[in-house]
């Protein structure tokens, strides 16, 4: 049975991860755990699950956006992507939009902020079959406005999971 499972998962699918951990901000309060969390997650994804990992530690706005575009542009229809972000987040109350704050961001200079909408747009544009986004930051809930109330959901059965594996998904 184990050989059957191993054979089933040996496909042309590739697994990519963009892992970002920002602790050391130029103009904002420094964080304690974001960088270490990113290192641990990148290590597990690479060494336990075989992901090709791009790890960005204390990345500025240009590096973060350029890497996001580079990865999402190269993905093919059977590829899978995990994006993990740990760092500061902020809400622009006037626009009611959330942002990731790279290490060169400041509250006075919003041009360095990365809009959650930019992240969502890149996820929508990529050809990857499956994309999972995990954001450990303030205002990460603004990434997906159509959030589902999981408390009222029926339990997920295996047939549903099998159907999802064959569809393009974004979580």
Each language-model region and where it sits:
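Short helix-loop-beta junction
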Residues: 36-52
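Glycine- and acidic-residue-enriched helix-capping/strand-helix junction motifs
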Residues: 24-39
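A generic structural signal for short coil/turn motifs at secondary-structure boundaries
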Residues: 26-30, 54, 108-110
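Conserved beta-strand scaffold positions in the cores of enzyme catalytic domains, especially
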Residues: 17-19, 53-56, 161-163, 169-171
